[in-house]
């Protein structure tokens, strides 16, 4: 009977360790996925800022050209 108890405790312990390792890997994967999503959002934001700056630069250049042309 004692052998059966020890075997059962060993199986339960190994199962808990395995479950703990799986949960840790799952958390790491979720964190990596969140980081990837944040990187994509930042990339999208920077492209919008770049486009806005390009448009503003073209408008300013056009205005300067008009002012120079009037003189």
From Swiss-Prot:
Q: Does the keyword ATP-binding apply?
A: no
Stored InterPro entries? Dermaseptin_dom, Frog_antimicrobial_propeptide, FSAP
Enumerate the Pfam families for this protein.
DD_K, FSAP_sig_propep
Coiled coil spans = none
The signal peptide here is 1-22
- Major subcellular location class: secreted
Which keywords annotate this record? Answer: Amidation, Amphibian defense peptide, Antibiotic, Antimicrobial, Cleavage on pair of basic residues, Fungicide, Immunity, Innate immunity, Membrane, Secreted, Signal, Target cell membrane, Target membrane
Residues that bear Valine amide: 68
Q: What effect is documented for mutating residue 51 to K?
A: Important increase in antimicrobial activity (both on bacteria and biofilms), increase of anti-proliferative effects against cancer cells, small increase in hemolysis, and increase in helicity
Q: Name one GO cellular component term.
A: membrane
Q: Where in the cell is it found?
A: Secreted; Target cell membrane
Single Gene Ontology BP annotation: innate immune response
Give me the residues of the propeptide, which is removed upon maturation. Answer: 23-43, 69-71
> Which family is this sequence assigned to?
Belongs to the frog skin active peptide (FSAP) family. Dermaseptin subfamily.
Tell me, in a sentence or two, what this protein's role is: Antimicrobial peptide with activity against fungi, Gram-positive and Gram-negative bacteria. Is active against S.aureus (MIC=16 uM), MRSA (MIC=32 uM), E.faecalis (MIC=16 uM), E.coli (MIC=8 uM), P.aeruginosa (MIC=16 uM), K.pneumoniae (MIC=8 uM), and C.albicans (MIC=64 uM). Also inhibits biofilm formation. Acts by disrupting cell membranes. Also exhibits anti-proliferative effect against various human cancer cells. Shows weak hemolytic activity towards horse erythrocytes.
Q: What is this protein called?
A: Dermaseptin-PT9
């Amino acid at each position: 009977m004692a052998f059966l108890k020890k075997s059962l405790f060993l199986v339960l312990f190994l199962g808990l360790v395995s479950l703990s390792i799986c949960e840790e890997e799952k958390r790491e994967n979720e964190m990596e996925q969140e980081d990837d999503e944040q990187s994509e959002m930042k990339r999208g934001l920077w492209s919008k800022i770049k486009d806005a700056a390009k448009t503003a630069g073209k408008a300013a250049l056009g205005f300067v050209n008009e002012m120079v042309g009037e003189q």
